[in-house]
Amino acid sequence: GLRQKVQSLV
């Protein structure tokens, strides 16, 4: 989901 995508950035 979006959460996983955001965590991928960090």
Curated annotation (Swiss-Prot):
One GO CC term on file: extracellular region
Main location (coarse class): secreted
Tissue localization of expression: Expressed by the venom gland.
Record flagged with keyword Coiled coil: no
Keyword field: Secreted, Toxin
Domain of life: Eukaryota
Molecular function as annotated in GO: toxin activity
Annotated compartments: Secreted
UniProt-recorded name of the protein: Toxin To64
Species this chain originates from: Tityus obscurus
